[in-house]
């Protein structure tokens, strides 16, 4: 339904093998864009409940970034792609799911096990974005919200190259780094 309403959105991941769908989509072309961002949502995010809002957010972020580049001298030809990554089973704490599911969600959100497992997939997703490009690496920005910021922070610490240049965290419970310099060194190392 969302893709039909927005034919310019690219489906990058669709996994039906788990308890809930996992998906990623892009506004713009991440294979050719100068700047690419990957947004990871947090607790209570599901493809069914979150994709509409995340598509709207991706389109809006792309438009805003493109306008800002157009205003900067010598940057008007740079392009932007924004990706929404609901590629993990985020913890769920919803009254509609009943008390046992809420307790399970509370346990999941109080530990980093779900985020740590998802971090492996997210790190590979970042690396895959860069590997799929024929024109050299993109300026890749990792964006994490809420529990998604923990997932993003852990993904940036996975050994190996992920190609992320910058990271943004908001509404964050923490990023599981001993100090800000840990993430800065990993991002700078991968951006080189």
What is each model feature region?
Residues 1-21, 27, 31-34:
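Intrinsically disordered, low-complexity charged segments of secreted bacterial virulence
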Residues 2-4, 73-76:
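Short, conserved catalytic or adaptor-binding loops enriched in Gly and charged residues
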Residues 20-23, 35-40, 45-47, 54-71, ...:
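Serine-dependent carboxylesterase/thioesterase catalytic core
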């Amino acid at each position: 339904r969302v893709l039909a309403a927005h034919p310019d959105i690219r489906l990058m991941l669709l996994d039906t093998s788990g308890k809930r769908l996992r998906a990623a989509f892009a506004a713009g072309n991440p294979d050719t864009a100068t700047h690419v961002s990957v947004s990871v949502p947090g607790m209570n995010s599901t493809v069914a409940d979150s994709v509409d809002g995340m598509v709207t957010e991706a389109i809006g972020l792309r438009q805003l970034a493109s306008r800002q580049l157009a205003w900067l001298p010598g940057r008007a030809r740079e392009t932007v792609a924004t990706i929404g990554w609901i590629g993990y089973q985020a913890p769920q704490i919803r009254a509609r799911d009943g008390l046992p599911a809420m307790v399970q969600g509370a346990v999941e959100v109080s530990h980093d096990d779900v985020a740590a497992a998802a971090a492996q997939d997210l790190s590979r997703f970042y690396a895959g974005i860069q590997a799929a490009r024929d024109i050299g690496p993109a300026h890749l920005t990792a964006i994490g919200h809420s529990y998604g910021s923990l997932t993003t922070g852990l993904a940036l610490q996975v050994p190996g190259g992920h190609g992320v240049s910058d990271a943004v965290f908001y509404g964050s419970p923490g990023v599981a780094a001993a100090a800000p310099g840990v993430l800065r060194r990993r991002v700078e190392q991968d951006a080189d």
